[in-house]
Amino acid sequence: MAGATLFERAQALSSVNREEQDSSLLNKLVRDQEGAENDEERIRIKEQGILQQGELYKQEGKAKELADLIKVTRPFLSSISKAKAAKLVRSLVDMFLDMDAGTGIEVQLCKDCIEWAKQEKRTFLRQSLEARLIALYFDTALYTEALALGAQLLRELKKLDDKNLLVEVQLLESKTYHALSNLPKARAALTSARTTANAIYCPPKVQGALDLQSGILHAADERDFKTAFSYFYEAFEGFDSVDSVKALTSLKYMLLCKIMLGQSDDVNQLVSGKLAITYSGRDIDAMKSVAEASHKRSLADFQAALKEYKKELAEDVIVQAHLGTLYDTMLEQNLCRIIEPYSRVQVAHVAESIQLPMPQVEKKLSQMILDKKFSGILDQGEGVLIVFEETPVDKTYERVLETIQSMGKVVDTLYQKAKKLS
């Protein structure tokens, strides 16, 4: 069969000197009209050939060629059912977006596909592509565009009752609001997504994404790392069951929760489990280094870990936010430990002891005094920190007030009883 021969040729393409072969094969795959147009077997083989060609381009990192393939297949898509065409387009677009090639044409390609779907009056395909465009806007930090398109799409989906896509868009909306630090709206969007998800079957990947976002919001908003850990664990198990790369992210955030809870000793125990052994690598090594520095309360080790694992720590927005809090806590603990024996100490000595620039130490000490972490003043003229002794609070006045209030209640009660007798 001619279609089968084309499919075999697509599979057998070599990785060098084949641009002309690619072009010739594509033309035959999408324009060859031999045989009946309603031949299901022939259509199936063409679909497989197109997907195989797309997979080859993805593996070889040929983003431009894959984008051209998506456009070239449109005449063929018009001759098959809407459901098959939608599945084929979504698969090719997903391949292109999964490449992370950074060509700069991702947004425009999605828009072109959406425009084509509008012209062909393929509503469900358009909505599915718009959901992918929202995800692309989120990944490229175009949050305003993501929210605008999301609001429009949500109105349509609620009318059509497409719950699977509705969950996806509501989850993206929650992520976008979180990125904008609008935590109340992020929580509201996530609650809507969970409510919708409860009414349908959610694949492990979608359920894992919901659990992951729940953990992130609990950690960010309420600093409830214990509950966040539970959600991250559920997400990890869900992603692990489908071999998703997000499982590593979930495990990383689980370790972060343990560190923030002051349970750094549990980190090694977690990463030695059967499930976690599969995910060993730089991300896990980075969290182990931070856990060790936290356990030792060593700022030097902490900064060394941040420097060595910059990509894994500083470039992860979620981890960076919480490690900033952890660094501040460790810095305060170290400063309190250094100044504790003194009533008057040179700021230069404190800076030297903690191995940080003097202006940074002065700023932090001033902040700690204002936050009432200790009593004292900074004499910048002399360059010294004067620490006051903690004077015990005299509670005599408080106790007198409590006694007077109690006596007042007794007198009021006696008055009410006397009033009844009279």
From Swiss-Prot:
Q: What name does the UniProt record give this protein?
A: 26S proteasome non-ATPase regulatory subunit 11
Family under the similarity heading: Belongs to the proteasome subunit S9 family.
Q: Which gene encodes it?
A: Rpn6
| GO molecular function annotation | structural molecule activity
Q: Which UniProt keywords apply?
A: Phosphoprotein, Proteasome
Quaternary structure, per UniProt, is: Component of the lid subcomplex of the 19S proteasome regulatory particle complex (also named PA700 complex). The 26S proteasome consists of a 20S proteasome core and two 19S regulatory subunits. Interacts with alien/CSN2. Interacts with Prosalpha2 and Rpt6.
Enumerate the SUPFAM superfamilies for this protein.
Winged helix' DNA-binding domain (SSF46785)
Which species?
Answer: Drosophila melanogaster (Fruit fly)
* Domain PCI intervals: 224-392
Q: Which GO terms describe its cellular component?
A: cytosol; nucleoplasm; proteasome complex; proteasome regulatory particle; proteasome regulatory particle, lid subcomplex
